[in-house]
């Protein structure tokens, strides 16, 4: 029997990088119940992605502070959240909990109200030295354990570094029973990355093919020449855009706040494997 769909609630969604990555890690089984995103440009991009079939359709709410989480109590398997990094980043002056963009208390309220067993968050590396201890304490108060890691986008082949902190929060009493649902095996691999025993058929979603996932570095002219010959129609869904484009600033801000989907997928698989291994 195929694992059941995973019902997700996405907070501070941005342009959906964390959502796409988690869906990739779970074999395309994420079923969003709702998304919360206040930026009009990002919300419009999400709606466009839904219309194009890139993301599953779901209502998009604009205000995290007034989101009616009580209506979803007991109906959410996994909460996703890329809560604002500016309170913890150097470029945002690291005002921490005093920053008006500090939205963690609202996410904590939603986590408590929905009683979701699992959450996956993303933030900047600087969060480790500002505010992270409070996040862990708040999660512990709700009965969560946590695993975390810092993973650069370059680790999955991107041409930029972009270190990101990924946090997996889980209720130990529930994670074991959800293990087969939340960590499906890739075809040909066991949960720990080994091949299955001789004579045993592989199961689960197919493993991703060995294909180039990113274009060459900006100054790799020979690489770009080969890439464009092989992929003449390649266009990213959101591009920086030249000067003179009215929404150029919105695009840059959206990209600056985004996470590479494959980066999120690798982090989710890594942390879930680690959590399951630590669960008695």
Task: Please name every model-derived segment.
Residues 1-6, 73-74:
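Short helix-loop-beta connector
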Residues 35, 61, 80, 120-121:
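Generic enzyme active-site microenvironment
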């Amino acid at each position: 029997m195929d694992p059941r769909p995973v019902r997700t609630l996405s907070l501070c969604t941005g342009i959906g990088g964390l959502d796409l990555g988690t869906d990739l890690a779970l074999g395309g089984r994420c079923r969003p119940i709702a998304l919360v995103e206040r930026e009009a440009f990002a919300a419009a991009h999400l709606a466009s992605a839904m219309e194009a079939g890139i993301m599953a359709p779901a209502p998009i709410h604009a205000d995290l502070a007034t989101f009616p989480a009580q209506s979803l109590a007991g109906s959410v398997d996994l909460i996703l959240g890329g809560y604002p990094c500016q309170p913890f980043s150097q470029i945002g002056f690291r005002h921490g909990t005093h920053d008006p963009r500090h939205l963690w208390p609202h996410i904590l309220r939603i986590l408590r109200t929905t009683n979701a067993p699992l959450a996956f968050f993303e933030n900047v590396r600087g969060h480790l030295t500002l505010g992270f201890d409070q996040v862990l304490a708040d999660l512990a108060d709700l009965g969560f354990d946590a695993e975390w890691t810092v993973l650069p986008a370059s680790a999955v082949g991107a041409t930029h570094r972009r270190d990101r902190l990924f946090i997996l929060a889980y209720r130990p009493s529930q994670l074991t029973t959800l293990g087969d649902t939340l960590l499906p095996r890739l075809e040909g691999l066991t949960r720990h990355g080994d091949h299955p025993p001789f004579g045993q058929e592989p199961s689960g979603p197919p493993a991703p093919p060995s294909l180039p996932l990113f274009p060459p570095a900006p100054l790799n002219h020979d690489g770009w020449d080969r890439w464009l010959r092989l992929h003449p129609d390649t266009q990213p869904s959101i591009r920086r855009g030249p000067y003179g484009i009215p929404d150029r600033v919105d695009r840059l801000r959206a990209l600056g706040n985004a996470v590479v989907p494959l980066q999120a997928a690798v982090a989710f698989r890594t942390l879930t494997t680690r959590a399951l291994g630590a669960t008695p």
